[in-house]
Structure formats: structure tokens, C-alpha cells
Amino acid sequence: MVTTGLEVRLHQGRERAELSQFTRTLDEVRLALRDIDQVYLLQGTRATWVVDDLKHERDDLVVRMQARDVQSTRPAADMQIPVLALVDGAAVLQRQPTVPEYFTKSTIERLVKLATPTVGVQGVSLAAYNGKTGELVELDDVVRENAKAAAYPSAISWGSVTGRLSELRTTEGRGAVRITIRDGRRAVAGRVPQDRTEQLREMWGHRVTLGGVLKRNASGQVVHIDVDRLEAMPDSDIGRSPAGQLLGAVEGVTDKQIDEYLRRSRRSHG
């Protein structure tokens, strides 16, 4: 199936969803797509998500979201990668408590929220679509508990991670800079002492090795690092992750090729 958008189903109970809850739910989905895109592509045109269709089916509110058409050197099909990664990641979390590809801790936390029933919204399902809806993935209790476990650090050790420094955020009054480092399809959040801010700014967008205290989840994945050592590394690519080069940077890549790549990726991890 050639993907053109994301279908979000909000399952209502006896109570209808309040407008504020409806918009909050959709905004969490939008932000999850943004988080994934920032891991997939360091720089480039970001998708603006618009409502393609809105309808009511029995007790479900069904919203279809598409990336707005814009003039850009980035192919429209490439902007659909976050949709595929979000649906695929939710399916991974139905099976096991691991951080899916292109997900960050914040993406995981958004899925926890989406999988938590609220008044008027008893559940949320996600699917890719192009005319016909693909396989729906229910954000159920299993997804919620696996997501919590995936983000929870269960082991601590000293070590290092290498990747491209992709995000810097100064936290007022806490004496630390929050960072994200990505390598291929993976991203790790971290904290760096605030007195290293200028050094971090010079390193932004470049490959670095960070040493410090690593926090791993039960699956052994590094989910956080408290940094005490920074080292610049030679740049081996510009802007896009290695997977991104396969999925969008090659001239002539098609929607079908992108979908097929993601299907193969799902099979290899399932």
C-alpha cells in the first residue's frame, strides 16, 4: 500500500469526547510524528499535518491526517516516513517492551498518554492509509505497559554512545543542558553540565562521542546518558540518518519503494 496519511480512531464510551480532549489527543499524535521526523531527518522541510477527513463511525471518531502539499526539495513520500514509523512502533510495543526505531523517550511518553483511557476517549487506534485503511494498531493496555517499561531505566553503568548531536535544550535553574544524540534509527536523550553549553553549540549537527553514566531499559537499550565527557568525531554523513539515505535521499525513490522497505524492516524485527 502506498501511504498518503495517518488514520486516527478515537473510541468513545458512554460519554462523548470533550472538544478539549479530542484536540489534545490529536496534538499528541502530531507531536509524536514530529519527534520521529526529527530523529529521521536532522534538517529539512517538516510536514505540516492537516485534516484530510473527519467522520463518525458508530462509537468512533475517525480522523485522517495528511502532510500539506508544499514546494520543497524533500519528496512528499519522504514526509510519510513518520506515519509508517509511528504505526510500526506501536505494533512493536504490542509485542515487546523495547524502544522502536526512530522513537525517543518523549515519543514513548506520548504513546503512554494515548494508550491511557480518559473520559470520552476510551481508546485510540492508528493506521496508515491511502484510500483504504491499513492494519489498525490498537494502543491498548499492553502497549501502555510495554512503553512504560521501554522508557524505564533498570540498569546503570559507565560507558559511551556515538552519534549526531541533534537537539539542545537549556533547562532553567537545573544547571544542565538536555540533549538528544541519534545514530541511524536510534536516539538517546541525555544531560550535560551547563558550563559545556558553548562546546555543545559548536558540536550541534556533528558526530560526537559522549561518555558518562548510561541508563538502560530491561531490553538492554540505552535510554539516557548523564554526560561527563564530549569528543568530536569525523562526520560521515550530512543531515540524514543512514536509513534516511535509503528511504529518501536517492533520486527517483518512490512511495512504493519506501513502503516496501518499511515492510521488510517490520518483518526483520518481528
Question: What function would you assign to each model-found segment?
Answer:
Residues 170-191:
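OB-fold (S1/OB) nucleic-acid-binding surfaces
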Residues 2-158:
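Charged, alpha-helical interface segments at or near domain boundaries
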Residues 156-171:
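Structural detector for short beta-strands of small beta-barrel domains
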Residues 9, 164, 178-180, 211-213:
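Residue-level recognition of well-ordered beta-strand positions that form the cores
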Residues 159-161, 186-190, 223:
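Short beta-strand segments
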Residues 215-241:
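OB-fold/S1-family single-stranded nucleic acid-binding modules
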Residues 234-270:
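Extended, charge-rich, solvent-exposed interface segments
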Residues 194-211:
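Short nucleic-acid-contacting surface segments enriched for D/E, G, S/T with interspersed K/R
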